[in-house]
């Protein structure tokens, strides 16, 4: 009996060992899972702290950056305000001068307007008197012509009405005849259509009956052939059919046995693969989770570095764009101010020069071209062929300035001609002054005249012209002439 008890206790100890081993494995798995959870929680807390710290640092940097930008902006605004105040004072002074000049022009224009209005009213009164007399004469002639036209209209109206009535009767007769012809032709066409329709119907019925008989005969022949072929096939395959049925029964039995054995083998293989798979899955899951956590950590660090770099780049780019925008805006404002000032100067000069325009320039401000239209078209085509597309597009925007450049060129030509004429007159004036001076010098005697060279002027038998020195050798036979 004790031997039997010992033999019975040995398998129980093995089962306990297996249970203890399984419990240890489960405890180790639970400990590993707890460690993984604690590690993931620690990493999440650390990531949250880093995000919180990065947000605080970003807010601090933004506040300091805003203060720096405000200081820079205030300095720029102070400079802009000083520049604007100076420009405003300068513009106010210019405007005051313009207002004074315009007030003078306005007073002169009012005087001219009053004088022109008086002369205009006098001329209008004279024209009204002439127009009333002319209207009375025209009214008399109009009444006479109206009576003659009414008489002619009445006679023409009567003749036209009579002719219209005759034409209406003629057209009614024609319409009745055409309607009768249409009714006759319609009746004949209907009869022809009915006869043709009946003929076609009869032909279709005959063709249909013939085709039906032909098809019925053909179907009967095909059915006889099919019955013969079926009978021959059944007679030839009866023996093969019996052998096939016996083999089919044997095949079903063997297939059932094979299926039972395969199911048993499959169950055993499934159990083995499941146990192996569980072990591999647990090990792989732990390795994969650790690897995923490491990869996530590296990715988070890389993304954090990228975000910091992008933030610095974006800040530098925004600062550059802001500086460039301010510089470009200031440059554009200056250019626009120059253009506006230039336009105002042009308008002022135009108003000032309008006083000095002649009557011809007021009536025809733009001179007509000397060239013919064909020559102008040829010149325009040549210019367009030589220019590029961009220049042509730009020139289209400035077509409205042609009249301005006409007046400008006209004024420039007049200026050049006046300068040339002035130079000629100054030259003539200088020559006349020189001639007048020579004439006056020949008439009068003064210190200036005495100091200048003059071959006609002799004082004490001596001229003021420089004479060349002559050396003369005295001979014994020569006589000296007394000086006069």
Curated annotation (Swiss-Prot):
It is found in: Cytoplasm, Cytoskeleton, Flagellum basal body; Cell projection, Cilium, Flagellum; Cytoplasm, Cytoskeleton, Flagellum axoneme. One of its GO terms (biological process) is regulation of cilium movement. Residues 92-160, 374-403 form a coiled coil. It comes from the Eukaryota. The keyword Cytoplasm applies. Keywords: Cell projection, Ciliopathy, Cilium, Coiled coil, Cytoplasm, Cytoskeleton, Flagellum, Kartagener syndrome, Primary ciliary dyskinesia. InterPro entries: DRC1/2_N (IPR039505), DRC1/DRC2 (IPR039750). Highly expressed in adult testis, in spermatocytes and spermatids. Also observed in spermatogonia. Not detected in Leydig cells, nor in fetal testis (at protein level). One of its GO terms (cellular component) is ciliary basal body. The keyword Coiled coil applies. It is linked to Ciliary dyskinesia, primary, 27: A disorder characterized by abnormalities of motile cilia. Respiratory infections leading to chronic inflammation and bronchiectasis are recurrent, due to defects in the respiratory cilia. Patients may exhibit randomization of left-right body asymmetry and situs inversus, due to dysfunction of monocilia at the embryonic node. Primary ciliary dyskinesia associated with situs inversus is referred to as Kartagener syndrome. PANTHER family: DYNEIN REGULATORY COMPLEX SUBUNIT 2 (PTHR21625:SF0), NYD-SP28 PROTEIN (PTHR21625). Component of the nexin-dynein regulatory complex (N-DRC), a key regulator of ciliary/flagellar motility which maintains the alignment and integrity of the distal axoneme and regulates microtubule sliding in motile axonemes. Plays a critical role in the assembly of N-DRC and also stabilizes the assembly of multiple inner dynein arms and radial spokes. Coassembles with DRC1 to form a central scaffold needed for assembly of the N-DRC and its attachment to the outer doublet microtubules. Belongs to the DRC2 family. This is Dynein regulatory complex subunit 2.
């Amino acid at each position: 009996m004790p031997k039997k008890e010992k033999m019975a206790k040995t398998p129980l100890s093995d089962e306990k060992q297996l249970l203890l081993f399984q419990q240890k494995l489960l405890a180790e798995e639970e400990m590993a899972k707890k460690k993984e959870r604690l590690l993931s929680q620690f990493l999440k807390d650390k990531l949250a702290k880093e995000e919180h710290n990065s947000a605080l640092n970003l807010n601090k940097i933004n506040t300091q950056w805003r203060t720096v930008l405000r200081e820079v902006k205030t300095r720029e605004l102070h400079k802009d305000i000083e520049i604007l105040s100076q420009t405003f004072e300068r513009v106010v002074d210019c405007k005051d001068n313009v207002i004074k000049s315009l007030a003078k022009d306005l007073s002169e224009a009012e005087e001219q307007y009053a004088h022109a209005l008086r002369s205009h009213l006098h001329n209008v009164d004279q024209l009204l008197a002439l127009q009333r007399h002319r209207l009375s004469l025209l009214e008399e002639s109009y009444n006479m012509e109206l009576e003659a036209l009414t008489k002619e209209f009445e006679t023409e109206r009567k003749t036209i009405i009579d002719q219209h009535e005759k034409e209406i009767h003629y057209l009614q007769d024609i319409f009745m005849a055409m309607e009768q012809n249409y009714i006759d032709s319609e009746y004949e066409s209907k009869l022809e259509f009915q006869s043709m329709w009946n003929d076609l119907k009869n032909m279709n019925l005959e063709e249909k009956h013939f085709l039906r008989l032909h098809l019925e005969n053909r179907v009967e022949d095909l059915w006889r052939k099919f019955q013969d072929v079926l009978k021959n096939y059944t007679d030839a395959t009866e023996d093969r059919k019996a052998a096939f049925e016996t083999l089919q029964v044997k095949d079903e039995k063997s297939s059932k046995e094979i299926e039972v054995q395969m199911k048993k083998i499959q169950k055993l293989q499934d159990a083995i693969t499941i146990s192996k798979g569980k072990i591999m899955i647990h090990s792989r899951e732990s390795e994969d989770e650790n690897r995923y956590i490491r990869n996530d950590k590296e990715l988070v660090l890389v993304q954090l570095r990228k975000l910091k770099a992008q933030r610095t780049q974006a800040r530098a780019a925004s600062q550059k764009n802001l500086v460039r925008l301010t510089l470009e805006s200031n440059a554009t404002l200056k250019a626009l101010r120059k253009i506006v000032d230039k336009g105002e100067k042009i308008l002022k000069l135009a108003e000032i020069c309008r006083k000095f325009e002649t009557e011809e320039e007021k009536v025809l401000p733009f001179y007509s071209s000397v060239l013919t239209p064909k020559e102008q078209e040829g010149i325009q085509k040549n210019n367009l062929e030589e220019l590029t597309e961009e220049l042509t597009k730009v020139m289209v925007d400035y077509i409205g300035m042609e009249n301005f450049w006409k007046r400008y060129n006209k004024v420039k030509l007049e200026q050049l001609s006046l300068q040339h004429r002035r130079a000629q007159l100054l030259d003539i004036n200088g020559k006349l002054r020189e001639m007048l001076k020579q004439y006056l010098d020949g008439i009068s005697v003064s210190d200036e005249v005495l100091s200048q060279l003059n071959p006609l002027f002799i004082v004490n038998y001596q001229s003021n012209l420089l004479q060349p020195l002559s050396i003369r050798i005295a001979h014994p036979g020569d006589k000296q002439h007394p000086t006069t």
